[in-house]
Structures are given as structure tokens and as C-alpha cells.
């Protein structure tokens, strides 16, 4: 092979590799990554494309469905199918739905001033305001209020995600300056009602305030069950987001201060030490691994996702709804497919709470 021919082949190979890398860089963002972009990016054509996607995915009720990558490139056939689904009754705040779409649309409109994005935004904001119960809580789904969908939902930070959005609107954060005063005032009122609901749903055990259940009854405000493995309990996971939200209040009332301190006391009391929750590769398991608890005296603190309200013991539940006190006793599919232990309260105790105390006094 001649040197010239070899050089030519190398040059062609270089072009192919360069094109491949460049093309990889141009791949459309996923929806989670689109939410993480800098403000400057929202002036881009890609941001415009994704914002227009959101208009197609938006339901007639005003909200959005969950578990969908709304940043994908849609074909004409995709668009036709989605437009035909607009009447579906699956608008939800579960799994970071609706409030994240509204956050994206606000940033897109602020950057590009496309009126259609503002119109969709206001429709979604009105949906959230309408979905709020008179007692201040939000259901997981609206207007579909079947089964546990109707419960006030803290699970996976659903209600807290909505309240953060409304708080930022009320506070006139830069990306929400286009919101009219009437809606801004409604957002502020909704946040205050939400805070009242949080305070009223904090579970009291033996005369002491503790934390919250992942769901609460929309009428009685009592802790409520959801799926078969999500029973009435004290939540070591969702309660972290609730406390952080309460800590973000600039001028907390005495009731808010008392709520925070009581929850922190519960987290201190309920932490689990000397253990790790690890995934061990195991091809015989459904997920390809098995999660097990191992002893480790150097491990940082953990909290169970759920605690028995009366005894404060960690509980673990499979799809048969039978309570176990050892995670190893529930079936493979649930044991390895759910976050039974969490460590999110560690930073709350070691960093967030001390800073809050410094700001608001002992």
C-alpha cells in the first residue's frame, strides 16, 4: 500500500471519527438534562424545540403526564398521536411532573418571548392553583382522584416541588417576572395554605410532634397508605424535603420553628448507625443485583424509608402488604426495586439545621 493511499485512508478515518464525535455532541438532550441547562441555553433552537414539545404533551386539563422524556425529537406521527391524547385524565405532580415543565416553559419564555409558551405556562399554573385542596394540600393526580391519587402527596417531594415553584413565582424570581400580579398573589396564598397543611399533618406520637407520612388523607389529614408496599408510617425520606422547605421560610412563625425542631429531634432519634445498604452483583436476581444490609462501624447514618408510627421501628413491606422488620424478608423484586434506606437526612442534620439555627437563633 502506498504512503499516499495510507495517508488518505487515515484522513478519511479521522473525518469519520470527528463526525461521529460531533454528532454525539449534537444528540438531543434528555428531559432531566434539559432541566439543568444554564439560562443562556434557553435562547437556543434546542430549547425552543423542547418548549414546543411541552405544548404538545400538555393535557387539556393543564398539567402533564409522568415518566416521559419530553425532550425527544418528535416525528409528525408522534405529534399526531400525542395531540390525540390531550384529553387523557393523567395530569399529575408525581415523579416531578407538571411543576418541572412549568419551570422550563418560564425560562424558555423569558429567553425567547414566544407567546405560545406563556399561554401554556399560565394554563399549567392555573391547573396547579385549581388542584389545591381548601386545606392546602395537593393530590397526586388531578382531576383523576381515584384511590390513593386523591391523597395529599408528599411522596417523592410532589407537593414540595409544587410549593417551591409557587414560592419562587410569589417572590418574583427573574424567570417568573412575566407572571401577572393576580396569579402571583394566588401563588403566595397557595404557599401559605400549603404551609398550614404541612403543620397540620405533622404526626403526633405520645404528645410529641414527629415527621410526616408520604401521603395524608385529603379530608381527615391522617396518615394514609398508597401502593401495597407503602403503608401508613413515618417517612424517613419525604420528611427531609418538607423540613428543608420549612427552613427556607424567611420569617418562620413560632409554629414553623416548633415543627422544624420537633422533626429534627425525630431524625436524631431515628438514625441508624453501623450499617450500610449495598448492592451486591447477582445475576440470579431480577435487577441483576441484590441489596443487602452489612455491618460497618465506620458507615455514616442511614434512615429507613418507613417507620412504624407506634413503635418507631423500621418497616419493610412487599407487594403482599405484610409488614416485616428485616428488609431481607421481602421479595426480591421489591427489595431491590425500592429505596428502603436513605441518607438524605445526614446533610440536613450536619449542615442545613446548624445554618438555620445560626440564622434564626436557638
Regions found by a protein language model. Name each.
Residues 118, 122-125, 129, 146, ...:
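Eukaryote-skewed repeat-based solenoidal scaffolds used as protein-protein interaction platforms
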Residues 44, 48-104:
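N-terminal carbohydrate-binding/catalytic regions of secreted carbohydrate-active enzymes
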Residues 1-26:
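Bacterial Sec-dependent N-terminal signal peptides
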Residues 49-62, 120-137, 188-207, 259-276:
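Long, well-ordered core segments of solenoidal/helical folds
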Residues 64-65, 69-71, 78-85, 134-145, ...:
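Intrinsic, low-complexity N-terminal interaction/targeting segments
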Residues 57, 108-111, 131, 169-172, ...:
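Residue-level signature of the C-terminal ends
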Residues 25-50, 168-193, 219-226, 230, ...:
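Terminal, non-catalytic domain-edge segments
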Residues 35-43, 82-97, 146-159, 225-238:
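Solvent-exposed loop and edge beta-strand segments that line ligand/cofactor-binding
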Amino acid at each position: 500500500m502506498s504512503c499516499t493511499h495510507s495517508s488518505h485512508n487515515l484522513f478519511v478515518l479521522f473525518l469519520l471519527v470527528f463526525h461521529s464525535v460531533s454528532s454525539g455532541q449534537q444528540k438531543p438532550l434528555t428531559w432531566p438534562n434539559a432541566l439543568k441547562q444554564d439560562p443562556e441555553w434557553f435562547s437556543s433552537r434546542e430549547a425552543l424545540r423542547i418548549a414546543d414539545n411541552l405544548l404538545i404533551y400538555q393535557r387539556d386539563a393543564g398539567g402533564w403526564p409522568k415518566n416521559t422524556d419530553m425532550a425527544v425529537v418528535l416525528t409528525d406521527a408522534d405529534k399526531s398521536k400525542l395531540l390525540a391524547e390531550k384529553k387523557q385524565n393523567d395530569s399529575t405532580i408525581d415523579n416531578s411532573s407538571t411543576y418541572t415543565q412549568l419551570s422550563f416553559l418560564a425560562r424558555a419564555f423569558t429567553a425567547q418571548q414566544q407567546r405560545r409558551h406563556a399561554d401554556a405556562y399560565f394554563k399549567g399554573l392555573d391547573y396547579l392553583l385549581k388542584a389545591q385542596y381548601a386545606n392546602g394540600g395537593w393530590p397526586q393526580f388531578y382531576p383523576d382522584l381515584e384511590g390513593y391519587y386523591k391523597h395529599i402527596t408528599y411522596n417523592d417531594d410532589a407537593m414540595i416541588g409544587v410549593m417551591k415553584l409557587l414560592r419562587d413565582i410569589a417572590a418574583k424570581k427573574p424567570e417568573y417576572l412575566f407572571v401577572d400580579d393576580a396569579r402571583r398573589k394566588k401563588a403566595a396564598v397557595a404557599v401559605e395554605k400549603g404551609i398550614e397543611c404541612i403543620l397540620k399533618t405533622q404526626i403526633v406520637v405520645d404528645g410529641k410532634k414527629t415527621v410526616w407520612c408520604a401521603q395524608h388523607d385529603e379530608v381527615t389529614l391522617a396518615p394514609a397508605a398508597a401502593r401495597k408496599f407503602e403503608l401508613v408510617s413515618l417517612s424517613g425520606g419525604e420528611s427531609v424535603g418538607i423540613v428543608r422547605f420549612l427552613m427556607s421560610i424567611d420569617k418562620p412563625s413560632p409554629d414553623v420553628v416548633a415543627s422544624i425542631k420537633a422533626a429534627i429531634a425525630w431524625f436524631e432519634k431515628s438514625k441508624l448507625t453501623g450499617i450500610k445498604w449495598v448492592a451486591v452483583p447477582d445475576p440470579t436476581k431480577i435487577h441483576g443485583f441484590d441489596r443487602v444490609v452489612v455491618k460497618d462501624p465506620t458507615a455514616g447514618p442511614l434512615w429507613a424509608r418507613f417507620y412504624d408510627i407506634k413503635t418507631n421501628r423500621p418497616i419493610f413491606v412487599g407487594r403482599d402488604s405484610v409488614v416485616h422488620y428485616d428488609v431481607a424478608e421481602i421479595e426480591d423484586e421489591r427489595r431491590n426495586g425500592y429505596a428502603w434506606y436513605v441518607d438524605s437526612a445526614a446533610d440536613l442534620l450536619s449542615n442545613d439545621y446548624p445554618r438555620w439555627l445560626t440564622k434564626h437563633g436557638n
